[in-house]
């Protein structure tokens, strides 16, 4: 069995890890970094860039550089959170035919799973380069508070990237695995506070150890899937835009290039203010008007940043209270607090969390790498490489169906340990009703319309009977990935209908297959591009070395040969500017054929040089003998 890699598919950065024996190892990407920016760019010449190369060119290509795509995955275009992003993102977010939030790049409509798959492909390639073998299986992490549609969309992204997703696990749970694996024995209850680039989670986890086996049991989880570092950046960007407008009378929001530069500067300033008390946002030539170029130079203090984001930090505290309440615990029951996600490096976040729990968070867990390490550990558990570890996760939101009067009737309550299965018997609302519609919902509100609709299906063929007589058994079955399977059965006729809940929109099988094929075609195109570059390099080398040999041959090369070679060199030079590998190879072949006389001359010159060199060495050796004899050491007799 091959390795199952662990991938933290983050909003801002992603990370990949593997199990090296019984030790998890975070892998460095081709650029030598342990984390990869979750940024994808589509260049003018049709190339797809992922990670640092995409980030570097963002300033000059803002409309075609996609970031924070995880905030759109599994979401509807009309969602309030998506509408907030539509107004601030430099790229175009559109409504797909099925109502999902998609992105349009260079006239092409793309689904978020398709874009996230590019990041997963980079993670896959990083692992393959390290292991020296193909990788086909992965454990991918998601925010604990992701709903069913978002989990499905993440699995779809894995498939499009050519990965079989063996398990979807929650990010805080993965961080707890990374933390608990190498800590000493004994039972403890931990709180994992995970504030990443785009999402926030809190999980209360109990680690029990019995006879050397560790059980990680999630007691409760809560969060906000649209709260993270990107929101902190936005607050600072808005402040800088307003200050510049006051000072210069120009609104930078109308200038995508300026906004992209500002985004990078704001992110950098935010990071600097975690260790410094103040910083300068200095952007020369940020824009221009009729009077000439304009420069931005604004001082930002840590106190100013904190005042801008205080409500965001406070927003993360409410879920902590709910999670503790759901777990039936008080603050004093928590033994350790673990911070995960880059945004937790902000001193204000650390201070608020410490105040809430009454203890300092642990500093020995790497907030950027813990989640990927935990995913790799879970991969090791699935392959059998990691023993004595049992993971008991929960479903983050209640699941149920719509019943008479537009009420949601819960079948599986939030924070139920998964996998789990629950059945309940319902009946008809009308006399002689021959079909029922099962409308599946996820959420905590009593009114069905206020919850997330996961889909619906019909159960037909119910025998005519007075209302309330037929017995319809509805079964909810949640698998270990937290994905829901629903069945409805008429106990009288034995008729049954089953579905795996796909997002009421989501990608259908044909769309996923097409995206998988496109990804494979891209891989083929990438391979051909690599071969073309290698051939070009060989052609360049041949061009350079032939010109040098023509120069060295001088008058020894007959004029006819020289003319033929010059003509072949020009033809090769032209071919090298094109995109046709076969044409370059053909011109290299032609050059080699007309250069035979040149090769002979070069070989003769080389042989003469070697002979001359050998003669010179022999003469030197004779001279050396004379010198040595002259300076022969004579020891005095004592």
UniProtKB/Swiss-Prot annotation:
Topological type in the membrane: Peripheral membrane protein
Localisation per UniProt entry: Cytoplasm; Cell inner membrane
N6-succinyllysine PTM positions: 70, 245-246, 304, 359, 502, 528, 587
Keywords for the protein's UniProt record, in alphabetical order: Acetylation, ATP-binding, Cell inner membrane, Cell membrane, Chaperone, Cytoplasm, DNA replication, Membrane, Nucleotide-binding, Phosphoprotein, Stress response
Predominant cellular place of this UniProt entry's protein: cytoplasm
Activity control note: UMPylation of the chaperone by SelO/YdiU negatively regulates its activity, and may facilitate survival under stress conditions.
Pfam families: HSP70
Taxonomic superkingdom: Bacteria
Positions of the UniProt region annotated as Disordered: 602-638
List of residues that carry N6-acetyllysine: 109, 245, 304, 421, 556
The UniProt record lists the keyword Hydrolase: no
Modified residue annotations for Phosphothreonine: 199
Coiled-coil boundaries: none
Modification after translation: Autophosphorylated; GrpE inhibits the autophosphorylation. Can be UMPylated on a tyrosine residue by SelO/YdiU, probably under stress conditions.
Biased composition (Low complexity): 602-620
Molecular functions (GO terms): ADP binding; ATP binding; ATP hydrolysis activity; ATP-dependent protein folding chaperone; heat shock protein binding; protein folding chaperone; protein-folding chaperone binding; sigma factor antagonist activity
InterPro entries documented for this protein: ATPase_NBD, Chaperone_DnaK, Heat_shock_70_CS, HSP70_C_sf, HSP70_peptide-bd_sf, Hsp_70_fam
Disruption phenotype: Non-essential; synthetic lethality is seen in a triple tig-dnaK-dnaJ disruption, although this depends on temperature (triple disruptions grow slowly at 20 and 34 degrees Celsius but not at all at 43 degrees) and strain background.
Subunit-level organization: In pull-down experiments interacts with CedA.
Job description of the protein: Plays an essential role in the initiation of phage lambda DNA replication, where it acts in an ATP-dependent fashion with the DnaJ protein to release lambda O and P proteins from the preprimosomal complex. DnaK is also involved in chromosomal DNA replication, possibly through an analogous interaction with the DnaA protein. Also participates actively in the response to hyperosmotic shock.
Family recorded in the similarity comment: Belongs to the heat shock protein 70 family.
UniProt protein name: Chaperone protein DnaK
Lineage: Bacteria, Pseudomonadati, Pseudomonadota, Gammaproteobacteria, Enterobacterales
């Amino acid at each position: 069995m091959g390795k199952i890699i662990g991938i933290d598919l983050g909003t801002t950065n992603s990370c990949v890890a593997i199990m090296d024996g019984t030790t998890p190892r975070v892998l460095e990407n081709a650029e030598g970094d342990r984390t990869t920016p979750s940024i994808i760019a589509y260049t003018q010449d049709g190339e797809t860039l992922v990670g640092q190369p995409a980030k570097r060119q963002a300033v000059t290509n803002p409309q075609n550089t996609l970031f924070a795509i995880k905030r759109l995955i599994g979401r509807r275009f009309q969602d309030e959170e998506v509408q907030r992003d539509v107004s601030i993102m430099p790229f175009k977010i559109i409504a797909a035919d099925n109502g999902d939030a998609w992105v349009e790049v260079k006239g092409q409509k793309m689904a978020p799973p398709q874009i996230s798959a590019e990041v997963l492909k980079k993670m896959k390639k990083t692992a393959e380069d390290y292991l020296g073998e193909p990788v086909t299986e992965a454990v991918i992490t998601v925010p604990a508070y992701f709903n069913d549609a978002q989990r499905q969309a993440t699995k779809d992204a894995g498939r499009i990237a050519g990965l079989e997703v063996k398990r979807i696990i929650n990010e805080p749970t993965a961080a707890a695995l990374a933390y608990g694996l190498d800590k000493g024995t004994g039972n403890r209850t931990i709180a994992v506070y995970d504030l990443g680039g785009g999402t926030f989670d809190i999980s209360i986890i109990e680690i029990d150890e019995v006879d050397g086996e560790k059980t990680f049991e999630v007691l409760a989880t809560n969060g906000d899937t649209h709260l993270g570092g990107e929101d902190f950046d936005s607050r600072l960007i808005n402040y800088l835009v307003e200050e510049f407008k006051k000072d210069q009378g120009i609104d930078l929001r109308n200038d995508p290039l300026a906004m992209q530069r500002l985004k990078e500067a704001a992110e950098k300033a935010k990071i600097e203010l975690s260790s410094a008390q103040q910083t300068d946002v200095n952007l020369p030539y940020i824009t221009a008007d009729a009077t000439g170029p304009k420069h931005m130079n604004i001082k930002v203090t840590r106190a100013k940043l904190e005042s801008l984001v205080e409500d965001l930090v406070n927003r993360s505290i409410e879920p902590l209270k709910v999670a503790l309440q759901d777990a039936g615990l008080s603050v004093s029951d928590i033994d350790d607090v673990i911070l995960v996600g880059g945004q937790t490096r902000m001193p204000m976040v650390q201070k608020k969390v410490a105040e809430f729990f009454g203890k300092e968070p642990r500093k020995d867990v790497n907030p950027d790498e813990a989640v990927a390490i935990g995913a790799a550990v879970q991969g090791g558990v699935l392959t059998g490489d990691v023993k004595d570890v049992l993971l008991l996760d929960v479903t983050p939101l209640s699941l149920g169906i719509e019943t008479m009067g537009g009420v949601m009737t819960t079948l599986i309550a939030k924070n139920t340990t998964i996998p789990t299965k629950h059945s309940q018997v319902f009946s008809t609302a009308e006399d002689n009703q021959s079909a029922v519609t099962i409308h599946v919902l996820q959420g905590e509100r009593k009114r069905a319309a206020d919850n997330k609709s996961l889909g619906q299906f019909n159960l037909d063929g119910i025998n005519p009977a007075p209302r309330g007589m037929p017995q319809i058994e509805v079964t909810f079955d949640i698998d270990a990935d937290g994905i829901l399977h629903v069945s409805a059965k008429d106990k009288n006729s034995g008729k049954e209908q089953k579905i795996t809940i796909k997002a009421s929109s989501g990608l259908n099988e044909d769309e996923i297959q097409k995206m998988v094929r496109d990804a494979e075609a891209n891989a083929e195109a990438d391979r051909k591009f690599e071969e073309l570059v290698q051939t070009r390099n060989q052609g360049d080398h041949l061009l350079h070395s032939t010109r040098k040999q023509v120069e060295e041959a001088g008058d020894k090369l007959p004029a006819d040969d020289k003319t033929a070679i010059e003509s072949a060199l020009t033809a090769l030079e032209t071919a090298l500017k094109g995109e046709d590998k076969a044409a370059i190879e053909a011109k290299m072949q032609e050059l080699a054929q007309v250069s035979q006389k040149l090769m002979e001359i070069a070989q003769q010159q080389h042989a003469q040089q070697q002979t001359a060199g050998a003669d010179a060495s022999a003469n030197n050796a004779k001279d050396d003998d004379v010198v040595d004899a002259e300076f022969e050491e004579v020891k005095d007799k004592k």
